[in-house]
Amino acid sequence: SHFLKAIRPTTPDFKKIKLLDVIEETVRLKEREVNAKNINIRMEAGVREPFVNGDAEQLKQAFFNIIGNAIDAVPENSEIRIITGIDSDHVFAQVVDQGTGIRKEDLPHVFEPYFTTKKEGHGIGMMIVHRIVRDHGGDVGIDSKQDAGTIVTLRFPRKSPRHRLLESNELQGENQTK
């Protein structure tokens, strides 16, 4: 049931949410795996609190998949950094690990359904991440070097697509009256 819910697209329930709350709750869900490998999760938040217009449950699913991949990739007694911040147009979150990394020839395929390099798993985790982030008007970037680690960056618009459209229409209306 949880598996089918994860792969079947649902309409996001958009609300203004604190991105850090979503990430911290996801980290708590992964606590057993983190403790089993003695991994230190280090949160690095920017000065301003990043808010996202999004569906908290869907975003938790995205971070659950990304953080799970990082946990799988790193050796015992290592660290995973989760960095959040805001730039001019976007709220971003990065999950940084120094694990096994992704081979250069595999990088173009990570969002494809059923693509996996793991012995276990279904190869749909990053496909789901990509879909969720895209449904939120954002994008996912992956920077990885084999045997050196991976940085997964999620970027979300600071304003929802609907809000940007309204603002754009208001600006056009102002230009027409002058």
Segments predicted by a language model, with ranges:
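Conserved micro-motifs of the catalytic ATP-binding
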Residues: 9-12, 51-54, 117
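A conserved beta-strand-to-alpha-helix junction within the catalytic ATP-binding
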Residues: 13-27, 86
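Conserved catalytic submotifs in the C-terminal HATPase_c
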Residues: 35, 40-50
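Short beta-strand/loop element within the Bergerat-fold HATPase_c
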Residues: 77-89
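Short conserved segment of the HATPase_c
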Residues: 102-114, 169
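Short alpha-helical Gxxx[C/S/T] motif in the catalytic ATP-binding
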Residues: 125, 129
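Detector for a conserved hydrophobic position within an alpha-helical segment of the HATPase_c
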Residues: 133-134
